[in-house]
Amino acid sequence: TRIIPPPREKPENHLLPQKRLDKTRVLIYHSHTSESYLPVSGKTHLHNGRGDVVRVGESLATKLREVYNIQTLHCETIHDHYPFRDAYKRSEQTVKQLLTENPEVEVVLDIHRDATPGLDHKVKIKGKTAAKLILVVGSERMGLQHPHWEKNYSFAKSLLEIMDRLYPNLAHGVILAEARYNQHLHPQSIIIEFGDDKSTWEEVSYSIQLFSEVLASYLNLNSTGYSM
């Protein structure tokens, strides 16, 4: 089934969701809260603290709320303090609690930034440079129970299709990983990486603007009314 976004002449109006503002539709959190951008903070990580990715999450949440009236919950809890290997275990507990408190959430996003050597994360879109995105979907290949992974994968591919129609080349694509990355907790849960450790804030901020429209388009077309 092809997903065709609505006309784009008036994004402020045609992307307004039909749900009440007080219903939380999007949950944003960070398993690797310390991740940062060298041009922004001078560091790749703000260890035991809130790195630049938290600013990304808050900026995206603000766009969704203020531009598209999509009620969004942004969690700033630090998850990757020592020992760092337990970051996903900690964020799993956070997400479980937040979904219990907000069972109507339709989309769960774990916001990161990439650091793959040699991968170009810059793309020109309408004359401005944006930081490219990567969508990461977990699976059950490591043997852990993950009943939703195919739904997560379908969700990511739907976002990518809208993205490619609205803003071609904004994303590198969808990566299907072996670990489940807490995505077993919700059928529309993915990781999104905004740029890499060398991205500037201007590039990342532009990507946030573009992606917020993509996500709003998806939600407007696919109102699920989840109750976990």
Description of each model-found segment:
Residues 31-35, 59, 63-71, 97-105, ...:
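Structured segments of extracytoplasmic/periplasmic soluble domains
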Residues 29-34, 76-77, 138, 195:
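Short loop/turn segments at strand-loop or loop-helix junctions that form parts
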Residues 22, 46-122:
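Catalytic-core regions of hydrolytic enzymes
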Residues 91-98, 105-110, 115-191, 195-196:
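Catalytic cores of processing enzymes, dominated by hydrolases/peptidases
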Residues 171-228:
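Active-site-adjacent mobile loop/cap segments within catalytic or ligand-binding domains
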